[in-house]
A protein has these predicted regions:
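Catalytic cores of nucleic-acid ligases and guanylyltransferases
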Residues: 1-158
């Protein structure tokens, strides 16, 4: 954020993202410049609310997927590095500078019950998850011993 052109970086370098999504991130950010760690989710599906039809039958609407940016960490804000600050504090800073919107989401932080979240994360288009120690620092380009990366979310066995 703070660059004149979309500036999404992936593991392999620059990632092309839609200008509208970049503009949405900029519009929802309350600072001049920021380095936000997150993921472009290509097939995001909003959770459906339970509705009732005229005959009293309950149903949920099925919506098509869309691309969103899901933010999960803030690494720098207005030129100040947050890399040495614990994750929980970086999260508080992230919530202070980035407002969630339909196309920009803050990923949930949970302390337990990952099994319950697995189905929700899969339904929303996430394919991997990173479990992090609340007090972990951020090391650019590396997974630390304080993190556990689950590369593929699988459906629960019956």
């Amino acid at each position: 954020m703070g660059h004149p052109e979309p500036h999404f970086l992936g593991y392999g370098g620059v990632v092309t993202g839609p200008r509208e999504l970049y503009d949405a991130i900029v519009a929802e950010t309350q600072c001049n410049t920021a380095i936000i760690d997150g993921v472009l989710v290509n097939d995001w599906k909003d959770e459906s609310e339970l509705e009732v039809d005229d005959q009293g039958n309950a149903y949920t609407r099925q919506f098509g997927g869309r691309q969103i940016f899901a933010a999960f960490d803030l690494l720098e804000v207005d030129g100040e590095s947050l890399l040495e600050i614990p994750l929980l504090e970086r999260r508080r800073h992230l919530e202070g500078v980035l407002a969630p919107s339909p196309n920009v989401r803050l990923t949930p932080y949970v302390t337990r019950g990952l099994r319950a979240w697995r189905d929700t994360l899969q339904a929303q288009g996430f394919r991997r998850v990173v479990l992090k120690n609340w007090n972990s620092a951020y090391t650019p380009g590396k997974t630390t011993d304080d993190w556990l990366v689950i590369e593929k979310l699988k459906a629960a066995a019956p």
